[in-house]
Amino acid sequence: MQNVLKSFLTPKNIQVQTISPCHFRILLEPLERGFGHTLGNALRRILLSSMPGAAIVQAEIDGVLHEYSSIEGVREDVVDVLLNLKGVAIKLEGREDAKLTLHKKGAGTVTAGDIQTESGVKIVNPDHVIAHITKDGEINMTLKAAMGRGYEPSSARSTGDQSRSVGLLLLDASYSPIRRVTYSVENARVEKRTDLDKLIIDLETDGTLDPEEAIRFAAAVLQHQLAAFVDLKQESDRDGGGKEGKVNPLLLRPVEDLELTVRAANCLKAESINYIGDLVQCTENDLLKTPNLGKKSLLEIKSVLAQKGLSLGMDLKGWPPADLTDQ
């Protein structure tokens, strides 16, 4: 069986073309015939549905009790303002949520750049229009941004009208930083073979996530999901233990073997996370609480672990082993 696996071609020519800062085109070749559509469709679906990101999830506007009303001195009604808030591209680093404020008075255009942010929060599209104020108008609002994945309707976060404060407006949240993904397959040639595939992925983001990083993360997610099928291990094995309680040797290796960036490695070392087994037991929230470890470093760690068939939040029974000593 191993000889058959080795006979499959793997992509050796990978090109990344930058169309714009938020638009990349990735070309992979050669692939066995049919694999272009197999991989292209899987990666596209993961990119569109499963990428983590941030979005504004709720708003409180002075003088507004519900979304079906208007704001004095503002051209748009509340529904339009909320729709425009959904278009704000926001990036949270090292935190799960953030409180934002917006205060503006006098005639003019209200843009995303008028939002006052906390540390670790960045507005990527400051020119995005939120509302227009007339001569004597004024707008004051308090916003909440949060991390998430995919799409979440406001009803999923509603705790009931009785416990919800008056004037708190919930927004449907589209957390995904991916704006558009398409793929196509063309013919590729290797020596005399002309029946091979070339996969072309066209990817656009909202600017909060680098397209190249996005495709790497999607590939890592796919690899991690398929890892269970490789050996068809029992659940206890996938949790880190073997059939006789043996520990996966990979978990005993130092974190340095993951070859993380200096920033990520130093953050883990400062928290006394010395072994890969220590790391995989941490959750995303645990790592985001680590000083100086941001979302980009978290994505890097998850991607590297996924490449090795591991993930964060694993339950390792009997960890650390009795014979494990600090190096």
UniProtKB/Swiss-Prot annotation:
Record region (Alpha C-terminal domain (alpha-CTD)): 247-327
GO cellular component, one term: DNA-directed RNA polymerase complex
Region Alpha N-terminal domain (alpha-NTD): start-end pairs: 1-233
Alphabetized SUPFAM superfamilies for the sequence: C-terminal domain of RNA polymerase alpha subunit, Insert subdomain of RNA polymerase alpha subunit, RBP11-like subunits of RNA polymerase
UniProt-listed Pfam families: RNA_pol_A_bac, RNA_pol_A_CTD, RNA_pol_L
Broad EC category: transferase
Alphabetized UniProt keyword annotations: DNA-directed RNA polymerase, Nucleotidyltransferase, Transcription, Transferase
Domain of life: Bacteria
GO molecular function: DNA binding; DNA-directed RNA polymerase activity; protein dimerization activity
Domain remark text: The N-terminal domain is essential for RNAP assembly and basal transcription, whereas the C-terminal domain is involved in interaction with transcriptional regulators and with upstream promoter elements.
Family label: Belongs to the RNA polymerase alpha chain family.
Known function: DNA-dependent RNA polymerase catalyzes the transcription of DNA into RNA using the four ribonucleoside triphosphates as substrates.
Assembly mode: Homodimer. The RNAP catalytic core consists of 2 alpha, 1 beta, 1 beta' and 1 omega subunit. When a sigma factor is associated with the core the holoenzyme is formed, which can initiate transcription.
Protein name: DNA-directed RNA polymerase subunit alpha
Organism: Coxiella burnetii (strain RSA 493 / Nine Mile phase I)
